Amino acid sequence: MSLRSVVKKIIPKDLFAIVEPYGHWLEAIVENIAFGFPMRNLKVIGITGTAGKTTSSTLLAHMLRESGYKVALMSTISIDYGDGKGPRSNNTRMTSLGSYKLLQAVKKIKANKVDWLVLETTSQALSQHRVWGVPYTVVGYTNLSHDNFHYHRTFERYRKAKLMLFKQANRNRRGMRIGVINSDDANSEYFIKAISNPITYGIDSGDLRATDLVLSPSGSTFTASIGGDKYNVKSNLPGKFNVYNSLAAIGIARSVGLDKNQIEQGIASLKSVEGRMNTVDRGQDFGVIVDYACTPEAFDQLFAAVKPMTKGKIISVFGSPGRRDELKRPIQGEIAAKNSDIIILTEEDDRDQDGQQILEEIAAGVVKAGKIRGKDLLMIHKREDAVEKAINMAKTGDLVLLLGKGEEHVIITNKPGFKAAPGHIFNEATDTIQRPYNETESAIKALDKLKR
């Protein structure tokens, strides 16, 4: 058992929550000294927010690469060291790495002489000082909504943690002190005040605005305008929420010097973002979409995007992670039930929590919305079986939504009663087991079996 696990068991939970960030802070300082401050002279773009971080970061990194820059990217789904070998899966299950692993990665990145590092930055990483010493040149903010309350406890603490990114960027004398902020978000003013050079974006408001918006199942087209500049945008990323993600990337790209052609071509040339609204097509006569949506707001946005393009029934498969924002479970259940014809609840990283209890908490919201157990509400704990059931139920014109996992490569389960097998990894720090799993592969397997 790790030292952290021992300390966590000895001292009260509330006290541990108070002292833990200081431990991370001290750790970050010591490790920066030990590594020789590898972040020095590195140009870093940080993006934070509840939703949209990964898509905005991936899109921005792609635009910079297409414009001739050497770019490294660290995101929820992948890490690209800027060595020309492309992204590797981020199997740590952490959007922002701990300071030691972060600095290890940065040493590799710096050796590759990159022009930019795009760093997806979470509220937990900020509040735990994991990113202490990161010289943010430009920062971006997507939105703030219901998530991570399991850690921050209150919305105000969550918001203050996000604000730390802007304060850190504003302290960087060598940086541009630019913050690109979603002005359509209710909390935008809070962040605008914290940065010397704010640039706002939005559909309803902002310095950078999207007009002439046309949404389709295959993406969107719109005009992005700021000052006297206009960008004719064609995006392959469907959904109104991806218009916001594109605007965030445009605002940052423009700030660091990309021109009109580079911005337009950069967006148009990105075909998809791994685990975000990805279609699985094996020649079947119904749709299958894999998406990482895992908050009430993300559910709202996703259903708003897919309902207009679905002729048949919507079958939604999802769960909720153990020890993570338990308040959202019935809320997501109700949203999904109101927008789906059939709900199949399943595992999504139970960790050390009882899986059936998690499903029952989601089911409370599903039942509230009118679904009936055994009829249009099913519970199938093993995720592979739930995916197969949904695909077997689908008819011509239907849509199967596989939500919450995206392109993650493991499922975290609790240790008691679980039989370990080859490929399973025991995590001593959390007393859990990771077993290999990929949503797209699971869907392909079920679809191929259906064809036979």
Locate each region found by the language model.
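ATP-dependent carboxylate-amine ligase
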Residues: 2-8, 15-19, 248-261, 265-273, ...
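Phosphate-binding loop of NTP-binding sites
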Residues: 3-183, 189-196, 247, 253, ...
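Acidic, Mg2+-coordinating active-site environments of NTP-dependent enzymes
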Residues: 40-42, 112, 137-288, 311, ...
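Cofactor-binding loop segments of dinucleotide-utilizing enzymes, especially the Rossmann-like FAD-
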Residues: 50, 76, 182, 203, ...
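Short polybasic amphipathic segments
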Residues: 78-83, 220-225, 410
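Short acidic, glycine/proline-rich loop/turn micro-motifs
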Residues: 83-90, 235, 412-416
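Amphipathic alpha-helical transducer elements in NTP-driven molecular machines
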Residues: 96-103, 159, 243-246, 296-299, ...
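Glycine/Thr-rich phosphate-binding loops of Rossmann-like dinucleotide-binding domains
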Residues: 127-128, 149-150, 188-190, 231, ...
